[in-house]
Amino acid sequence: MARSAYLALYRHVGAPLRWDQRLKMPATELDALLAGESLHLYVLRDVSGEALGFCEFDRGAFPQIELKNFGLVPQAQGRGLGPWLLATALQGEWRSNPDRIWLHTDEWDHPAARSVYERAGFRVFDERDEPADPL
């Protein structure tokens, strides 16, 4: 996926959730990440080809895989698409037989996120308070 398309989708999904990590990355670093082998990206599209959401996995520490980003654009939320996208993406990742697939979340995540993660098989491993990055 081209950087401009990725960032447009990242912004559309992530703005309400205060996502900013990829926006802070230098362009060359993001280009390398998008072109590299360690990033697996699953994009949900409607029949016209418009991106409705995505799952992004970091396989750089395989056999552990981290779910780095997951979400839907606001107009696609509440229609059951999130659980379907996550389940489909996880099926793809489990095919490579990782030891585990994990994620971390925070209080800025979508209110339904934790229940979606739990229904997909994720369980709480650790909870901690961390200082927030200044805006």
Briefly describe each language-model feature range.
Residues 1-22:
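Short amphipathic alpha-helix that is part of the acyltransferase structural core
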Residues 21-25, 34, 38-40, 45-65, ...:
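A conserved beta-strand-loop-helix scaffold within acyl/acetyltransferase catalytic domains
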Residues 40, 99, 123:
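Short acidic/polar active-site loop segments enriched in Thr and Asp
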Residues 69-72, 78-93, 114-119:
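Conserved acetyl-CoA-binding loop-helix of GNAT-fold acetyltransferases
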Residues 77, 103-113, 130-135:
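Conserved beta-strand-loop-alpha-helix junction that forms the acyl-donor binding cleft
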Residues 93-105:
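Conserved GNAT acetyl-CoA-binding A-motif
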Residues 118-135:
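Active-site/acyl-donor-binding loops of N-acyltransferases
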